[in-house]
């Protein structure tokens, strides 16, 4: 199995509910190590750039507004098949469709206020990690 890295963002709704520690426990209990982390208030420019892939979608403006509405917790996760494992832990984008016990089933409110973001591929993970972290900020352990 491949050791991978992926990005995870705990969105403003989950930060506001004070569930960062509960989410971190799920990562660690499932073999994902946190090798970099920072709390950040995203600027409008950062949110627009990070989610630029969605700029032509009808939900883009609302997503950018939501992601700049409060602080986020951004972390790099490392482990075997980290991208897929994190996506399984997150659950479906729509929390009403997310499996019981997933992060979104337990902490998300709606399809647009859905607690967490995670990379969808190893390639996108590398780009997303580089967007928020320099190599010197990542501490393999």
Curated annotation (Swiss-Prot):
Superkingdom to which the source organism belongs: Bacteria
User: What GO molecular function annotations does the UniProt record carry, in alphabetical order?
Assistant: ATP binding; metal ion binding; nucleoside diphosphate kinase activity
Where, per UniProt, does this protein localize?
A: Cytoplasm
Q: Name one GO cellular component term.
A: cytoplasm
Q: Does the keyword Repeat apply?
A: no
Tell me its cofactors: Mg(2+)
GO terms, biological process: CTP biosynthetic process; GTP biosynthetic process; purine nucleotide metabolic process; pyrimidine nucleotide metabolic process; UTP biosynthetic process
Q: Print the keywords alphabetically.
A: ATP-binding, Cytoplasm, Kinase, Magnesium, Metal-binding, Nucleotide metabolism, Nucleotide-binding, Phosphoprotein, Transferase
Name the Enzyme Commission number(s) assigned to this protein: 2.7.4.6
Name the catalysed reactions. Answer: a 2'-deoxyribonucleoside 5'-diphosphate + ATP = a 2'-deoxyribonucleoside 5'-triphosphate + ADP; a ribonucleoside 5'-diphosphate + ATP = a ribonucleoside 5'-triphosphate + ADP
Q: Detail which positions bind ATP.
A: 11, 59, 87, 93, 104, 114
Any one Pfam family here would be NDK
Main localization is cytoplasm
Q: Where is the active site?
A: 117 (pros-phosphohistidine intermediate)
Q: What does this protein do?
A: Major role in the synthesis of nucleoside triphosphates other than ATP. The ATP gamma phosphate is transferred to the NDP beta phosphate via a ping-pong mechanism, using a phosphorylated active-site intermediate.
The similarity annotation says: Belongs to the NDK family.
Quaternary structure, from the entry: Homotetramer.
Q: What is this protein called?
A: Nucleoside diphosphate kinase
Report the gene name.
ndk
